Amino acid sequence: VGFQSLSGAAERNEQILFMVVDNEGYMNTGMQRSSCTPYGAWTSTTPVGKGSGGMRSQGKTQDAKNLPLIMVNHRCEYVATASTAYMEDLYDKLDKAIQASKSGFAYLHVYSPCTTGWRFPTDQNMEVARKAVETNFVMLWEYNPRDGLHFTRSVDDPMPVTEYLKAMGRFRQLSPDQISHIQSKVVENLAFVKQMAHREA
């Protein structure tokens, strides 16, 4: 919500730390889809099953927008991704973001599962967050204009993305073709970020 003002503040390099706690949807207002909701996911506005016209819906039909990479293209003082599964990494990046915001715009994107909207037991929260990273569905990296982009946690032998997807009810309806699409996007996104890291080095 409110990307126009976020982009404007970043372009002006305002001395702001902007943190997004990303649960991949509008979870506090009824679990609606957002542009950061993953492809295939169930939400209250991307339902699963037959609709009134007899057409079968299988979740969100678009891929998620990669907001952190959009912020890198604003050439912010600092941009990073983090996960609630790796708190030391998150705290380290928060410290860096606070320092960077003293001289310009800093952006921190924290992936945080929502047990209700993602449909899994509360006691599995950390496990779901960890599997997102260990499958490369979520990548942990940081960027600044001087040092470029680099990974803070490399996953050299990732688990298949199915290990992440099957942990949540929001993906229960996926077809084999949809799962294949998601796995191919994970590989594609990883290659793209690696290319950016190489270019920025």
Where on the chain are the PLM-derived regions?
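Short, hinge-like loop/turn segments at secondary-structure boundaries
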Residues: 34-38, 124-127
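Active-site lining segments that contact anionic ligands and/or coordinate catalytic metals
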Residues: 102-107, 146
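Hydrophobic pocket-lining "lid/loop/helix" segments that shape and contact the acyl-thioester
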Residues: 91-95, 101, 115-118, 133
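Short, conserved beta-strand edge motifs with alternating hydrophobic and charged residues
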Residues: 20, 79-82, 107-111
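Flexible, low-complexity linker and terminal segments
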Residues: 112-201
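Short aromatic-enriched loop/helix-cap "lid" or pocket-rim segments at secondary-structure transitions
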Residues: 30-33, 120-122
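Thiamine diphosphate
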Residues: 1-32, 85-92, 96-97
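Conserved thiamine diphosphate
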Residues: 35-100
